[in-house]
Amino acid sequence: MATTTPPLDRLSPAQAQPAVVVRFKSIGSAPIMKNNVFKATAGHKFQAVIMFLRQQLGMKKEDSLFTYINAAFAPAPDDTVGSLYKSFGTEGHLIVNYSNTQAWG
């Protein structure tokens, strides 16, 4: 009987890292995403979320993008998604507001 290797996205529970549900919400004149809910690995840095968001919005490197957690503060790019969720998660989501102009602070 032949065995097959599971796909990379189907790791065993011992190997799998927890996922965090991230909900993106636009602010001001920023483009609205058609699908705004995604899962991110808890161990990823917030910088990975920013890069993913830029890709989803089709932004160039020189385009401005400001991100906020719960419309309150701008997280550091080296914060982990998991720590942000543990501290600021709302109703099972990490809410990330985004704008192409500075909205707060």
From Swiss-Prot:
GO terms for biological process: autophagosome assembly; autophagosome maturation; autophagy of mitochondrion; glycophagy; piecemeal microautophagy of the nucleus; protein transport. One of its GO terms (molecular function) is protein tag activity. It is found in: Preautophagosomal structure membrane. It is a peripheral membrane protein. Gene3D superfamilies: Phosphatidylinositol 3-kinase Catalytic Subunit, Chain A, domain 1. InterPro entries: Atg12, Ubiquitin-like_domsf. GO terms for cellular component: Atg12-Atg5-Atg16 complex; autophagosome membrane; phagophore assembly site membrane. Disulfide bonds: none annotated. Its main location: membrane. Pfam families: APG12. Keywords: Autophagy, Isopeptide bond, Membrane, Protein transport, Transport, Ubl conjugation pathway. There is a cross-link at residue 105 (Glycyl lysine isopeptide (Gly-Lys) (interchain with K-168 in ATG5)). Ubiquitin-like protein involved in cytoplasm to vacuole transport (Cvt), autophagy vesicles formation, mitophagy, and nucleophagy. Conjugation with ATG5 through a ubiquitin-like conjugating system involving also ATG7 as an E1-like activating enzyme and ATG10 as an E2-like conjugating enzyme, is essential for its function. The ATG12-ATG5 conjugate functions as an E3-like enzyme which is required for lipidation of ATG8 and ATG8 association to the vesicle membranes. Belongs to the ATG12 family. Forms a conjugate with ATG5. This is Ubiquitin-like protein ATG12. The gene is ATG12.
